[in-house]
Amino acid sequence: LSMSDSISVMHNGSIIQTATPEQLYEAPASRYVADFIGESNLFNGTVRQMQGDSVVLRTEQGLELTSPLTPTGKALSADVAGCIAVRPELISIASANADMTREVKLQGHVEDRIYLGNSTEYRVRTQAFGVVCVRVPRQQDHGANAFEHGAAVSVGWDHANGLAMAL
């Protein structure tokens, strides 16, 4: 993200967030901003309950996810449409039979493996959410740690790795 010191993101002719590149990536104000800079796994749903600075969201698939509010997400309230964004580099991947100690765990199959030089991106087809994108640093993705197309895997993340925000 070699950009300006401050960036304004516009949508439909209005500025929706002005921040540093790091703030835009780490604390997007909305789903649009989360998708604007970098890639995110975006899970839409309805806010079921607010718990302090966290949100319990019932996804469109009927699952409940808990995540902290993005610093600009204070406008969310119960029964409002919302979204939880999880960046690909914050999601773990392991063989399907591995003991993964993450708060959210999904089973799936590797649909695509993309070598990016400094990392490898896996696109994992899950029954719960469709395709989930996972990015693994190069030093962790070699030999026995690499997963080929069709491999049965588990993907997972902790609640703190997501950010709840307005659509």
Which positions does each model-derived feature cover?
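Internal alpha/beta loop-helix hairpins
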Residues: L1-L63
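Non-catalytic connector elements of ABC transporters
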Residues: S40, Q49-L167
